[in-house]
Amino acid sequence: MGLSDGEWQLVLKVWGKVEGDLPGHGQEVLIRLFKTHPETLEKFDKFKGLKTEDEMKASADLKKHGGTVLTALGNILKKKGQHEAELKPLAQSHATKHKISIKFLEYISEAIIHVLQSKHSADFGADAQAAMGKALELFRNDMAAKYKEFGFQG
């Protein structure tokens, strides 16, 4: 399941583009997530009142949270699979407080890949997409394992 050094390089190259505007990318990812899987919006009390894409785009809180999400993910990706210290508190909060299912992590992974394809197509060809898919799958699998440690089947 692990990624090769070359695959990690592809992941981190495109992630460097994301880091140029974490809040903007994060906002787009969350909007994509909420549009394609509206049930995920119910997990965010702060955003439940946002009914249209225009309302979502105008929300400073949504943009801020998007930046928070992608900052945390970036910190995990940069560890190239050696992310135990970064993953544990994230898994604990998502399992015990937020109750975010692994299925929802799959949905946000799809949204991330979609946003990267649309914003960075030159740096996100088939090889980079496959590598990012593997990196996000590794993240989800490790989150699922941690969830079980916290007694959440997610």
From Swiss-Prot:
Keyword annotations from UniProtKB, A to Z: Cytoplasm, Heme, Iron, Metal-binding, Muscle protein, Oxidoreductase, Oxygen transport, Phosphoprotein, Transport
Catalytic activity: Fe(III)-heme b-[protein] + nitric oxide + H2O = Fe(II)-heme b-[protein] + nitrite + 2 H(+); H2O2 + AH2 = A + 2 H2O
Binding positions (O2): H65
GO biological process: oxygen transport; removal of superoxide radicals
Gene3D superfamilies reported for this sequence: 6.10.140.2100, 6.10.140.2110
Pfam families: Globin
Family listed: Belongs to the globin family.
Assembly behavior: Monomeric.
Protein's UniProt name: Myoglobin
Gene that specifies this protein: MB
